[in-house]
Every structure is written in structure tokens, then in C-alpha cells.
Amino acid sequence: MTTPRARAYLARIGIDEPVARTVDGLERLQRAHLTRVPFENLDVYAGREVRTDIGWSVPKIVDRGRGGWCYELNGAFAWLLGELGFGVKQLGATVLLPPASTEFEHLALEVALERRYLVDVGFGDSFIRPLPLDDAGPHDGGSGPYRFEFSGEDTTLVFDGPDGPEPQYRFGTGTFGADDFVEQSERKRRDPQQKWRQSPFATRLLDGGPDRVTLLHDRLKLRRNGEWSEQPVQPGDEWDRALRQWFDLVP
């Protein structure tokens, strides 16, 4: 039976009926989360507290209506999936996109059904459906082609973009918990040289994707039918209005 807290979380992402423990049900949850809960750095940019534990992340998302970064979004989503009866494993990943990354700075999820799937609701403009981990691919990620490269116990997620392969992140077989990401979270939120502290942003899917809206510090970007458009946004009141209009958030 779904708990009241899990039902409140489902309502937050726009789901008001039971979700089957199948890959289709998992995809529905992933797309709903990516649509309703933005990937954003507003608290980090403002110098406010953020934490990695679900005692922080679930209330932030469900009660305060905010988004967050990978530790909050994937940590909370892992809790929800567990409440719904999915088998979930938290992975520590090394981001391979520039700038250079430190080891295990990203939290991603492995979900076990009839196959093992990689799931992520905290990596910005990335795949939007579960990717089977027992098959190198390529796979239709809902937003483009993705595949895996296997080397020993390590797996690398690769996006096959129009300009060639783009390695996204690498992860192993270990299981991670919220405490394992505290040091990384604190370092990134406190260091003024980190990109997370440089300028605010928010991004989410539109209507389950792959259409997307992204608000950067000086412009609003929209992807519709595979084509991007953008318009300038002035910092201050205009930026705050765009944040409210597209994300129902205040800074």
C-alpha cells in the first residue's frame, strides 16, 4: 500500500493513480519527475543550505515545491521508487563532461526489474527513459541515442550526438548512500569557483519531453520538435518573472 507521503510525492509530479512496477511504469515516473521537478541550482547559487539526506530533499521537493541538483533529485527519487516497491541502488559516478571532475561526484540510480536499468532525474538535459544496463546499445534515450561502454567493473554512459560521441559519466558496481556525497556537496556549494556558484539556472522537460525549457543567467532557451530557440532575459525582475512563469519558482 502506498504511504501518504509517497502519495504526496506522486501528486507533486502529477500522478494520481497506481504505477505498475514495470519498465513502462518506471519511464512514466522518470518523465513525470523530469517535467515537474526542475534541475536547478538556486539555493546553491544563493549560498543557502543544501543537504544530501532524504530528510532534506523530500520535503524540499514535495512541501516547498522546489527542485535541486543530483544529490537532492536522485536521492529523493530513489526514496520514492523504494516506497513504490522498486529495487533501487544508488551509484557514484564520475562526470566526464568538461570541466574536469572529481571521482564519484554525481549520484545516479540503478533500478532492478526484469533487467537492470540506469535512471537519472538529476543530470540536466540528458536521457529521459530507463536505459538497460545489460546491453551496450545504442538505446533510444527519448532525447537522443545513448550507449554504454564496458571496461571491467566500470560502465561509461555515452551520448552519440550530432558532433560525435560525448562521454557523460562513468560508474562502477558499488552501492552509495547519502552520506557518501556529503563531502562533494559541501565542496561544490561552498567553493565560489565552482560553476554551481557562478550563475543561476533551471531546466525541465515540457509535457514529458523531449521538449525542454532552460533558463540561464541571461537567456531563456526552448526546445520544441528538436529545434532550439532562445531569447535574452535581463537579470533582476525580468529573470524572476521567467522563473515564475516557466518553473513556478522564486529565487
Label each PLM-derived region with a short phrase:
Residues 107-110:
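Short beta-strand scaffold segments in enzyme catalytic cores
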